């Protein structure tokens, strides 16, 4: 099973996807899980053992030429066209994730139902948008929809050995700690 998770949001939002990753990997232990997210938020998941590849979307500044923006968008989308994903889970309501889902030939495409009928056509399984729930619960809705048992709702972050060593050095250098 080859899976693509899409979350184009901020650092905390990306971290809150980790329960979904762990539950998917527990149910599909031999799966390949890729993650598409905004550049600058990858530190929350770059050491996560449940992720095989990370695709970074680099935002452009508002002064960038419209043609350069368009080329950048097209090049980003092209990365996904020939990937043979079985499952796409888009946890973002915007158009970028919907376009990626539409371009792939995945058998299952899960995304949030929006007011846009065009965006909704990118998916064959729609999730209701429910803003009155904790984001972890919303992020776990795809596994519920697929009838995958939820083993854990805990958020987790992983650090490299270099990160741990650097932190220990800094802590050891503090007085009265």
Feature-to-residue mapping (PLM):
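Catalytic machinery of carbohydrate-active enzymes
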Residues: 1-177
